[in-house]
Amino acid sequence: VSDRRPPAPETDLSVRLGPVELAHPLVDASGTLDVLEYARRYDGDYLADFPYAAYVPKTVTADPRTGNPPPRVTETPSGVINAIGLENPGVHAWIAQLGEWAALRAPVLVSVGGNSPEQYAAVISALEAHLAAAPPGTVPDVRGYELNVSCPNVVGGLQIGADPTATAEVVGACRAATARFLLTKLTPNVRDVTEAGAAALGAGADGLSLVNTFKAMVLDRDTLRPFLGNRTGGLCGPAIKPIALRMVAEVARAFPDTPLVGMGGVMTGLDALEFIAC
């Protein structure tokens, strides 16, 4: 009698994020991974063997941004605070490298940032024009956009995402610029996250992603001054997971038919399962 067990049946983990079909529920969060840099430094086959079901690149803006002064990153007892400042080369330089992504075996949701509705829409319009003109196979599979409305707003230093009216204006401008799937990334730094969610959906967003990082500060123990060059930054990691779960659950209850992407402190498969269960 053979003690060899039959192979376990394959489990279908595929899901749909609105119109976007995903092989499984795991999507990388914007800013956590640069696929081109990783492929260049560590694994030339990474684009073809990409493990995530979709790729959300670091936020791109209409004009180049140098980001915040260093230091930009520091650890905490249960997470990391970063203050990168949306450093990026601007949409036109960013578009110029899209050909290098053509081998990426996953749909792409482009993260878009800005300081005004016009800036957000300008990024999307430039990308739409390029994608429409590009020959097949020369660009990645861009399925939609994630609107990062948690970036600083120059008017009074506020966050766009903290103001439902400003959020709706950004989403409306972007909705007019594309027919592709549109996610709005919500800030957790508000009293009621569902207010901005309702504003985004009312203005034409197809889905919501949450949460972005929590505004936080670390002091230099020697000088007792803020450690980061920007004074404050965004806290991520295990410390924020219970709060992120609560917010995702609130949004899921408020908008039960809306596609959602949950994030914040996911370190293990069980962490991811908790977000799915919300």
Model features per residue range: what roles?
Residues 149-165, 196-258:
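Glycine/Thr-rich beta-alpha phosphate-binding loop at enzyme active sites
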Residues 31-33, 60, 113-115, 150-152, ...:
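Active-site beta-loop-alpha junctions enriched in small/polar residues
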Residues 2-108, 114-115:
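N-terminal capping/small domains of soluble enzymes
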Residues 77-159:
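Active-site beta->alpha loop and helix N-cap motifs at the rims of alpha/beta catalytic domains
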Residues 28, 55, 94, 110, ...:
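Conserved, mostly hydrophobic/aromatic
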Residues 21-27, 104-109, 177-188, 253-263:
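Short beta-strand/loop segments at the ligand-binding rim of alpha/beta enzyme cores
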Residues 37-45, 120-130, 190-203, 252-257, ...:
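Catalytic cores of alpha/beta
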Residues 59-86, 143-160, 214-219, 229-232:
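Glycine-rich, proline-tolerant flexible connector loops at the mouths of alpha/beta enzymes
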